[in-house]
Amino acid sequence: MWDIHWKAMQRIIELGFAKEVYVRYNTNLSRTSLKGIKLFDLLPQFQDWQVCSSLDGTGEVGEYIRDGLDYEQWLENFKEGLAVAKTSREMRLDYTLTMPGLLELKNMFDLSQELNVELLTKVMFTFSPTEVLSPLALPHELLCTIIDEALEYMEPKATRKQQSLIDTLKNLKNRENLDDMFLGIDAVVGRKKGKERQQRIDKIRGQDITKILSRDKRVLEWWTSI
């Protein structure tokens, strides 16, 4: 967050307007303080507030998808917010489903239950056949199998706080994948270009997506076959 954010928040409080202001963040939650000013000391002074914290997977997978994420620091920051939250909608998880993130479905579900917070869920945009990190890049049968395995684990113990994840997964099974959206050679060539682009990005970042995908042999075999 920019310096001006912290100054503005303090100024609103100093002028006595905080009780008239609703504050909402969509944030990586990588920083919760600056120069002694703490976000979760400020927020309770406002009329209402909400933090939707972006997370695409736990641990190593989450750190791969969202470059720069320190998962353990993120978790510490999120729990700091939970300590001052008075309603269930003040601290929520915002999960964007990606292809590598499908390997984290059970872990994200468990995290939501362990923290007792709502897990808002959406799917990565897929505007081009090069979007190989989209779950819709996977063959439809494999995607549905992964989803069904996750639902079998989740549904018996899910609460309303995980319902967004379950609904999104069920909807995802009925969506067109890259082969349906971009017929024939376009889908094949697009995947190859997308894979090459991701490999270049990995090289720059010093990462390797195959290390992540090796968690599921089926997904790794698909990736290798592109």
PLM feature segments, named:
Residues 1-4, 13-35, 43-76, 90-99, ...:
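Core AdoMet radical
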Residues 5-10, 35-39, 71-80, 105-108, ...:
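Well-ordered, non-membrane alpha-helical segments in soluble/globular domains
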Residues 79-82, 113:
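Class I S-adenosyl-L-methionine
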Residues 85:
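Betabetaalpha-Me/HNH-type nuclease active-site subdomain
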Residues 99-102, 120-151, 158-172, 183, ...:
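Flexible glycine/acidic-rich beta-alpha junction loops that bind and position SAM and/or redox cofactors
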Residues 99-115:
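Catalytic cores of alpha/beta
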Residues 151-226:
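Radical SAM enzyme core and accessory elements
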